[in-house]
């Protein structure tokens, strides 16, 4: 199993759909015996440049450990989901579990059950 960092950007009108989308992606990873090491909902943020005349979008970060086949399935799901504006998948050498620098001084909206308090405290 390999480690990956995935960031995807969702259309702001579909922000309510993000938890359901994340749950679907978590299920795909779990079915292949993969692990989610970090899952962060960065919320709505300003885009660096407009995409289809949209200036804000909903960001989600996932650090996972799974097979390349599952990553391919996830990328296909991103590609065919009209709500996902952009996505980026990077292969990493090690699992990353600490809070990301994008969160800054904000509290993390950590979507992993049970780990939210621990991740914010560290």
From Swiss-Prot:
Keywords: Ribonucleoprotein, Ribosomal protein, RNA-binding, rRNA-binding
Gene Ontology biological-process entries: translation
Pfam family, one: Ribosomal_S6
Tagged with keyword S-adenosyl-L-methionine: no
Keyword Ribonucleoprotein included in the entry's annotation: yes
One MF term in the entry's GO annotations: structural constituent of ribosome
Protein name per Swiss-Prot or TrEMBL: Small ribosomal subunit protein bS6
Organism from which the protein derives: Neisseria meningitidis serogroup C / serotype 2a (strain ATCC 700532 / DSM 15464 / FAM18)
């Amino acid at each position: 199993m390999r480690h990956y960092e995935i960031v995807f950007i969702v259309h702001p009108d579909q922000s309510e759909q993000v938890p359901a989308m994340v749950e679907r992606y978590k299920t795909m990873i779990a079915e292949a015996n993969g692990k989610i090491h970090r899952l962060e909902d960065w919320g709505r943020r300003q885009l660096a440049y407009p995409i289809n005349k949209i200036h804000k979008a909903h960001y989600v970060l996932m650090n996972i450990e799974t097979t390349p086949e599952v990553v391919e399935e996830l990328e296909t799901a991103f590609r065919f989901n009209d709500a996902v504006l952009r996505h980026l998948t990077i292969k990493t050498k090690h699992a990353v579990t600490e809070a990301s620098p994008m969160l800054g001084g904000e509290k993390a909206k950590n979507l992993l059950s049970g780990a939210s308090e621990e991740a914010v405290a560290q």
